[in-house]
Amino acid sequence: MVDKSCLCNCNIFLIVLFISLCLLFGIVKCDEFLTESTVEFSNSGSLTEILSSEQYVQKFVCNDNGLIQLRLYMATFSRKNRSHLYVSLKDENYDEIKSWDIDASLLKDNAYHTFALDRRIRDSKDKTYFLCIKSDAETGQGVTVYYNDDENDLGLSLNGEKLDKQLCYQLVYKKTLHNSMGGGLKLQFLMSALLMIALFAVVYFGRDWSIEKKFLTIWTMLGLMYLLTLPLFRAPDEIAHFMRAYEVSQLDLLSELEESSGIGGSMLPLEGVDFFALKSWLSFWGNHKTIVLSENQVFKHFTNTAVYAPVSYLPQAFGMIILRAFTKNIAVISYGGRVMNWFAITILMYFAIKVIPFGKEILAMIALVPMNVHESVTLAPDGLVVALSMLMLALVLHFRYARQDILKPWEVCSLYITAWAIGMLKIVYLPFGLLYCLIPKERFGGIKKKRRHIFAMAFVAVASNLLWLSLCTDFLRIEATDASAQLSYSLHHLGTFMVVMARTFFSDLDIWATRMIGIDLAELNIRTVGFLIFAYLFMLVFRYIENDRHSSDKTDRVVNGICVLILVSIVLLIAASLYLQFTPVYNNTIVGIQGRYFIALLLPLYFAINKPSRLMVDREQNDISMREFGLIVCSNVCACIALFFSCM
């Protein structure tokens, strides 16, 4: 038996470790945000080697406060020079601020060399400074500096004589956090910091809570944290998602096709709206009040989201309708859509983890991957797909293993709605409807009633999707693609298509796996902490295989088989749909597959390789440990830190 005090000390150590990681990462990202360099000058050539009889002086004026470093673009003539370079920085009164004695043999050829000050100059803005360069080199042992001569009177002199040149230098400024943030950003920063503290407090003090309570608390706090750190329209295609959601909020369920361009879109009150002014926090707080709905409606293109059925945007549209009644501010309306989408996903997730009879810990771990929480607070429907797929599987397992009586009419109705909705959200997830084959016939009142309901559900789901596809086929136009030619080629060269798919998987599977967890967020251009993402992935893999050690019975093999069929079907549909619609004809790889498309497949994957009957027996023993919840929270907090400082 492990001593309780030892276990407690270990848990405290882990919490302190995770908090320290978050703080250190926050310091690193904050330092990157506060450090700013001037642009590099293009080099026009290099000076002659700097000899003992020469002194170059570069005059410059700082355009910001906080000068902390200078960088010179230097050359060594591809040799080791036995000399010293003497560099000094002087103020406008020619008083020395700092001097450097550089061993020329240590300089790197054709590279910037950094000269760091002992402390930042707080009031350097608009002040004049002089950079003096001397050497003790004899001929053949000197180094040099590159120069730029694009303009006249550029401040460089040699032994007091002006040259129409300037050195290729960079100035590095270190701003202060206080001066770099306005009131709104400071409030966001403070609230995010408090949420981080609260999250780790829940991990430690809530260790004896039920898994449902822990999940809901951590999910809610993380959702708020992502809302505070991810600016509007920074998720993939979020501007297009906003336009489609706004169109649905106007009760325009089907987009239009612009005759002149053949591109899908709609008439929206967005004349002159600059969405990009809201995509960074500094710009957001300076511009959000002036970006409002226009009086005139203009045609806006969003053909890639015009194909989405209205059900994909029902929560977002509802939030927009409510906020639009009070304001025309686009930022406020957008956040109304974001929050309502997140709220709907939260409800579905909570019901899923509440009703699932076993595997609650796996469901929570999957739901809390940084990419899924990130997508759930945006206007995109990806988080809704994951939540609904989890609810479907949770209901099926509940009806199969926990229920003994016949389903009530409203429960049967919920099965119809979820089977219809999952396909309408994204047609490639239609095979999730196969889960309903796992519900015992006794729950329907007999085999005939079960078959009748299963066929009816399949008909409703498939027919609805085919009808919608027929209505929006014209919107499926991507530049440099030809779906009909691609389909014809694939049917006549099925083996080639399989090779293309295999090549794509071998080439990109590692990228999909790490992006599925959340190594790259926002528009997939902001890197989080890689080793935490790999640790999260390893944690999931370990959880997936640790229970796979018992013999299975026939009922287990049925569940495993259906889940495998769902996985294979959806993967093939994702590959085929993107090959037809987004990939240029005859391309040797499939274009457009994203890691987040596979998040919804993680839960059925777990039940495809584990034994449900054994999981049901061991369900009371399965929980998420403090170290696992600590890793989950640490990964997400670091992701939010990266988003906040990288989106300035």
PLM regions with names:
Residues 374, 410-427, 432-438:
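Membrane-interface alpha helices of multi-pass inner-membrane proteins
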Residues 210-213, 328-331, 350-370:
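Transmembrane-helix signature of polytopic, membrane-embedded enzymes
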Residues 378-385:
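Short acidic/glycine- and proline-prone juxtamembrane loop motifs at membrane-interface regions
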Residues 7, 17-93, 107-112, 116-128, ...:
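Beta-sheet-rich sandwich/jelly-roll-like modules and their strand-loop junctions
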Residues 199-202, 335-358:
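Transmembrane-helix motifs of polytopic, lipid-linked glycan transferases
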Residues 395-406, 430-462:
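Perimembrane helix-loop-helix junctions
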Residues 178-185, 291-300, 465-550:
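Membrane-lumen/periplasm interface segments of multi-pass, membrane-embedded glycan/lipid transferases
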Residues 252-336:
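Interfacial juxtamembrane loops and adjacent helix segments
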